[in-house]
A protein has these predicted regions:
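Short, well-ordered beta-strand elements
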Residues: 5-7, 22-29, 153-163, 186
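A bilobed periplasmic-binding-protein/Venus flytrap-type ligand-binding module shared by bacterial periplasmic
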Residues: 9-15, 70-95, 99
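Ligand-site clamp/hinge motif
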Residues: 11-58, 175, 184-186
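Immediate post-signal peptide segment of exported/extracytoplasmic ligand-binding proteins
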Residues: 18-23, 90, 138-157
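Second-shell loop/turn segments in exported
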Residues: 26, 81-85, 92-95, 126-134, ...
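Ligand-binding "clamshell"
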Residues: 57-69
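Periplasmic-binding protein-like
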Residues: 58, 83, 87-124, 169-170
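Structural transition elements
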Residues: 115-147, 164-169
Length: 189
């Protein structure tokens, strides 16, 4: 069963003598953040990723594990389906960008252990271009929606391929932020 995890074993015919150093590795998906941390702290797991941002300080303070906080090549974003009529208008897409307080999102969902994206690739990636942040401006978002013909907002479906705790926080935050400018978000996972 794929949800039980994946076990890979050492290839006895590996081209480099003495490698790999491990006989086997087992990856197990652990959706709930606290469970993943507990498994690492008790030794049930040797590695936990992602380490829940809200628990980084506690794990560091315990001193039982090494916690590396480094720039990431991961980027979280919301993609809009431009084949949907509502998203064909650039003003709607801009409005949604203005409607989300990304600095607050970093604090709420990542306990400050993230950076607001300023381009289509993380700035830690070579040759990434910094496009600059979109400021949080819900009034401008409302004005753009009105100009685009949505003075009362609209309803949209958000699909998420992630169901872990941090993703849930992000989705809830986005629902709240977008609701403030009249956009009702239904979530599908």
């Amino acid at each position: 069963n794929p949800s039980d995890g994946l076990r890979v074993e050492k290839n006895p015919n590996y081209w480099r003598a003495g490698y790999p150093k491990l006989d086997a590795i087992t990856w197990r998906p652990v959706v709930e953040n606290s469970t993943r941390v507990a498994m690492a702290l008790t030794g049930e797991a040797d590695y936990a990723f992602p380490l829940p941002s809200e628990q980084v300080k506690m794990v560091k303070d315990k001193g039982a594990l090494r916690v590396d906080v480094t720039p990431s090549i991961m980027l979280r974003f919301v993609e809009m389906n431009l084949t949907k009529p509502v998203f064909k208008d650039v003003r709607v897409r801009q409005a949604l960008n203005y409607a989300v307080n990304k600095e607050a999102l970093v604090k709420v969902a990542f306990a400050g252990y993230a950076d607001v994206a300023e381009g289509i690739a993380p700035l830690s990636v070579d040759y990434a271009v910094k496009l600059g942040p979109w400021p949080y401006d819900p009034q401008k978002a409302k004005a753009l929606l009105k100009e685009a013909g949505y003075p009362n907002g609209f309803e949209v479906e958000l699909w998420s391929g992630y169901n872990h705790t941090t993703a849930s926080k992000i989705i809830q935050f986005l629902q709240q932020q977008l609701a403030q400018v009249g956009v009702k978000v239904r979530v599908r996972t």
